[in-house]
Amino acid sequence: MQTSHIDELAASGVWFSRGYAANATCAPSRASIMTGKYATRFGYEFTPVPDPARFILTWLAEEDDAELKGRIDREVANNLPSYFDMGMPTEQITIAEVLKDAGYYTAHIGKWHLGITNGMDPQSQGFVDSLSLAGSSYLSENDPEVVNAKFDTSIDKMVWSTSQYAARFNGSKPFAPDKYVTDYYTDEALKVIENNQNRPFFLYLRHWAIHN
């Protein structure tokens, strides 16, 4: 297979030969980026999972498909606090808080996953503006831009067909972007750079596409 465009990008881009992460899972790794600490040191070693997702994961653990087989501690799963009560401890100081106090304009774009209530949301953690990804980030199942490719597994209908657009600005009502979410968030990030080029700013851009 010829991959001339990818080869050209690789030849003219930056090559990262080593990558490091402070945690093996999503949210704790993000907490480490925000605080400069190992998340396990302040009690945030697990990724908060929305209530419906807990049911899905438990269901998958019972599937016969070996590729989806997992292990679920039912006692723990059934006694977790609400998703809305979980997040990075608010006493932790983020880089956004430090830079905001130093006079920087601070903006968050993309996924957050460090809490959405009780002072754990982006704006309470040092960001002046936040264009977030709330929940899933999928198009509607019947969107004309979607090429439907169904799989013979029960999770396909459960997740794909029930997930909707989830862009949200400063905690407002979720809305549908006018383009693919990766393009949308990239374009909005470029606007932040353009609009703030003459003053100190900090942009935290977290795309969803490379996550899953």
Language-model features, listed with the residues they occupy:
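Alpha-helix exit/C-cap motif
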Residues: 14-15, 39
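Short, solvent-exposed loop/turn elements at domain surfaces
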Residues: 18, 41-43, 137-142
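Active-site nucleophile/metal-coordination loop of metallo-enzymes that catalyze phosphate/sulfate
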Residues: 21-44
